[in-house]
């Protein structure tokens, strides 16, 4: 079985897909990663609001580690994220609040990854939708 480099966790937002592809191409990862796409990316797999989704992601990550021999998780969130707005509820929402939500989701996923998959490297990126 061929060894791949990583699993990429990214958001379902259609506006975001070309950005993810371009980012991974620049990183020379085309054809070298498995992919998991879910609303909010790290937000979707860590927020209590989306708890039912969490095990599905971690089961897929475990499968990719076994089948594809990956050694890294690349988490790519984006600005203007609808999932961030959903978990924020009806409260005031702005870029500063959204940055905190992304940061919290990265902290939470890193904690779980370090516990469940201690040998797995992890990287985080928040992409802008507009240049």
Residue ranges and their predicted role:
Residues 1-20, 39-53, 65-72, 82-131:
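Divalent-metal-activated hydrolytic enzyme cores
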Residues 31-41:
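A short beta-strand-loop structural module common to alpha/beta enzyme folds
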Residues 78-80:
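Short, ordered loop/turn segments at secondary-structure junctions
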């Amino acid at each position: 079985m061929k060894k791949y480099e990583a699993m990429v966790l990214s958001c379902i937002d259609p506006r975001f897909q070309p950005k993810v592809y371009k980012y991974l191409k620049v990183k020379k990862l085309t054809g070298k990663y498995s992919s998991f796409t879910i609303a909010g990316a790290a937000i979707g797999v860590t927020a209590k609001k989306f708890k039912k989704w969490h095990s599905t992601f971690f089961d897929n990550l475990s499968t990719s580690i076994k089948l594809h021999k990956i050694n890294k998780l690349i988490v790519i969130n984006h600005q203007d994220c609808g999932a961030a707005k959903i978990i924020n509820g009806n409260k005031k929402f702005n870029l500063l609040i959204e940055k905190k939500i992304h940061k919290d989701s990265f902290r939470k996923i890193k904690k779980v990854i370090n516990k469940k998959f201690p040998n797995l490297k992890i990287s985080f990126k928040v992409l802008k939708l507009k240049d």
